Amino acid sequence: MHKEIWTIGRILQWTEQYFQSKEMDTPRLDGEVLLSHVLGKDRIYLYTHYDQPLIQEELDAFRPLVQQRAKGYSVASITGQKDFMGLTFKVNDKVLIPRPDTESLIEHVLDTYSEDCNIRILDICTGPGTILLSLLHYLPNAVGVGLDISTDALPLARENADSFNLTKRVEFKESDMFSALRGTDEKFDLIVSNPPYIRTGDAKMLSQDVLNEPHIALFGGEDGLVFYRILARECGAYLETNGRVAFEVGYDQAETVRKLLEATGQYSNIQFIADLGGHNRVVTAVYEG
């Protein structure tokens, strides 16, 4: 009996159609990334080897990844990696996957400070180290501390620091917001944060991809502002005079977060930074003490 031959081109075509039937947003791209991961090749290789037959071991490895994607797990959590700001982060389904929106915050900080600055950075809700490690990579004289309550996220953050050769310049600590710093005299030049900010009532509007990420990293209470209130209230205790804050916010939260900072009477030069979609995605301010 003639055995069916699955080439790279044929399996990609089948996968694209299958993902389309599941109403995936990027069916072709998802299939390409998953197959590239299985083969250990880049996506260009797929197009230059379209007629290459896949061996049984490759098909057996590919099938469960397709099934996971069909269940709504993100491609990044399936492959265990996500490219962000020119770096490849290790990720999994226990952490918030790095998103393009967050690049707006990092690019603003890099525009604010000179490349040779020797600032100290604190990252609250660091997750896999997305913001802090990206900044340290591009600011070679800076050092930083990353805090997170998740004992699942911190080992990944440390692995990423090791991958990027940053372990000597960064420390990660388990901490419920600022709890690990209370009672210390630590001061920082910059505090960054991408805290959970989705309103709990908005869960029904989220895609399955997002809902499969840890809810502790997504939801910021009924109004989405629980963690911004803590940041506004407590950042000043750990900032040098004229230090700065930079927070990622939900697409409609910038004005409210500005008011929270203003209400402390400690901040000036409060600004919004828009993302590529034109939404104010970052709130920054200078601490005056």
How would you describe each model-predicted region?
Residues 19, 161, 235, 261:
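Conserved hydrophobic residues forming the short capping helix/wall of the S-adenosyl-L-methionine
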